């Protein structure tokens, strides 16, 4: 039996003769970039492609608004035309003539043939007065909605960046805590193994201590994985090179208090309904749908206008009135038309009106859905923050008790009053309590940021930007076309 134990002891000793803390499981990156929360938020504001796309849509909406406001501005058509006819023509009285004639027109417009007007006027205004009146109003609401949507998109992305940075900092802190626990577990395993080899402790205690140390080593590896994955996700949000490892900076993980949690929930909801940009964007969509509905109601009663004016030089001739191309002189034409359109005996107009009314109802329903979402986000974030605040105190108390128990068990073990398994159990409790404190702090800080953004503002810049930093490893630089900050509009929700 003793001979069988010697190889086992040698195996345990060989396993314990490894570097502690364990070397990184994930190969080291080619470089690191330190980043604090304020720097991450500023980078996302400038480089995130989703935010840039939302702001580009504001420019698109402004372009559409310009086009809507210009519906009744005239178009200018300089041009010329040449006409040649050879062969039979029939007069209105029925007489058929064999005729060769030609004409030439140049100046403003085109399409001047025989006695008709210039078919393509030099100055031409054509448009439905219904659209000329209502489309600028709808386009203005589109601009408002796009601006608020860009704000809401920025808030969403910046919140995601803040959540990921807090998670990265917590994961790095967890990694440090797991390494500390691994080192303490390894030291305990070495001591228990030495006593077991000397015959002063049971072999089972040595095996159990070694198994616990290996579990701690695996926990360190999982923590390394979490740090690397979170850093890559944050780099994606910041449009940075993911091969450069982001390293959290800005100090230790501490509670961040942004919103006073004793504020009544209904007050928070009332403030959010006044300031949420996504709700303002949806209200603009409702207003735009209402404009389009009234446009279809007015369409059968408002005419379409057609105005044309042309001026140029015209001349021509024929084999009946020679010369065949002469008699050039100035000419001008002015034409005006108004007409009303009843589409498909009115059925087409009714169809358009019903469609626009349905779209208005859909927009109203989406606005109510956003209102409910705002209420739910405020209530949930506040509840999460309140629960996490209590969990922080519980976890800290748990850690203090576990550390006291560990000290007492170590002292008892040194005096041969306790078994090593008791120290091992206490160390396991300390390691778990350390992770619990970090997790509670992370949940509290994330809930505070969610509550702050749910009220309608972007995440705050809590610190000044880092100084003397190298340029960030941006993969494809973006330049947001239209920075949007703040929204002065009030929605009027109670």
Labelled PLM ranges:
Residues 338, 356, 363, 385-388, ...:
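Hydrophobic, well-ordered secondary-structure elements that form the walls
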Residues 42-52, 59-75, 87, 109-140, ...:
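A glycine-/polar-enriched beta->alpha junction
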Residues 150, 154-271, 384, 388, ...:
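Periplasmic alpha-helical coiled-coil/stalk elements that build and connect Gram-negative outer-membrane
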Residues 1-6, 86, 242, 367, ...:
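Acidic, low-complexity, intrinsically disordered peripheral segments
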Residues 24-32, 79-125, 251-262, 293-298, ...:
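Small/polar, glycine/serine/threonine/aspartate-rich low-complexity segments that form flexible
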Residues 40, 47, 54, 125, ...:
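Amphipathic alpha-helical coiled-coil segments and their boundaries
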Residues 15-43, 47:
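Regulatory alphaC helix of protein kinase catalytic domains
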Residues 223, 277, 284, 440:
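Metallo-beta-lactamase
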């Amino acid at each position: 039996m003793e001979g069988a134990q010697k190889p086992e002891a040698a195996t345990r000793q060989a396993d314990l003769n490894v570097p502690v803390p364990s070397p990184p499981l994930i190969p080291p990156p080619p470089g690191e970039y330190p980043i604090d929360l304020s720097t991450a938020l500023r980078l996302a504001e400038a480089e995130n492609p989703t935010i840039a796309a939302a702001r580009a849509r504001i420019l698109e909406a402004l372009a559409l608004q310009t086009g809507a406001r210009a519906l009744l501005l005239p178009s200018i058509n300089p041009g010329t035309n040449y006409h040649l006819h050879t062969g039979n023509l029939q007069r209105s009285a029925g007489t058929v003539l064999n005729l060769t004639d030609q004409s030439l027109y140049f100046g403003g417009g085109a399409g001047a043939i025989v006695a008709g007007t210039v078919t393509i006027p030099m100055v031409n205004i054509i448009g439905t007065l219904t659209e000329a009146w209502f489309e600028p109003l709808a386009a203005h609401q589109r601009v408002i909605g796009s601006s608020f949507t860009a704000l809401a998109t920025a808030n969403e992305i910046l919140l995601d960046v803040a959540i990921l940075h807090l998670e990265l900092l917590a994961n790095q802190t967890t990694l440090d805590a797991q390494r500390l626990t691994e080192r303490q577990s390894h030291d305990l395993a070495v001591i228990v193994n030495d006593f077991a080899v000397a015959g002063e402790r049971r072999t089972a205690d040595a095996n159990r201590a070694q198994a616990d140390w290996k579990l701690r080593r695996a926990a360190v590896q999982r923590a390394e994985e979490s740090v690397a994955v979170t850093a890559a996700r944050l780099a994606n949000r910041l449009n940075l090179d993911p091969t450069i490892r982001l390293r959290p900076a800005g100090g230790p993980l501490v509670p961040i208090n942004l919103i006073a949690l004793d504020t009544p929930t209904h007050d928070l909801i009332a403030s959010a309904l006044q300031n949420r940009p996504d709700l303002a964007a949806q209200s603009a969509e409702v207003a735009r749908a209402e404009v389009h509905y009234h446009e279809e109601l007015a369409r059968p009663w408002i005419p379409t206008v057609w105005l044309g004016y042309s001026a140029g030089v015209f001349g021509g001739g024929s084999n009946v009135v020679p010369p065949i191309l002469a008699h050039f002189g100035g000419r001008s034409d002015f034409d005006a038309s108004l007409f009303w359109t009843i589409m498909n005996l009115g059925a087409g107009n009714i169809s358009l009106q019903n469609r626009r009314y349905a779209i208005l109802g859909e927009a109203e329903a989406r606005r109510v859905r956003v209102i409910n979402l705002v209420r739910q986000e405020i209530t949930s974030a506040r509840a999460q923050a309140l629960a996490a605040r209590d969990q922080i105190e519980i976890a800290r108390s748990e850690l203090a008790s576990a550390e006291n128990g560990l000290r007492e068990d170590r002292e008892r073990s040194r005096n041969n009053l306790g078994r090593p398994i008791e120290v091992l159990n206490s160390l396991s409790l300390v390691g778990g309590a350390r992770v619990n404190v970090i997790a509670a702090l992370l949940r509290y800080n994330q809930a505070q940021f969610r509550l702050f953004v749910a009220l309608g503002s972007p995440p705050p810049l809590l610190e000044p930007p880092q100084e003397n930093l190298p340029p960030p490893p941006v993969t494809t630089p973006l330049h947001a076309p239209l920075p949007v900050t703040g929204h002065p509009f009030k929605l009027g929700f109670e």
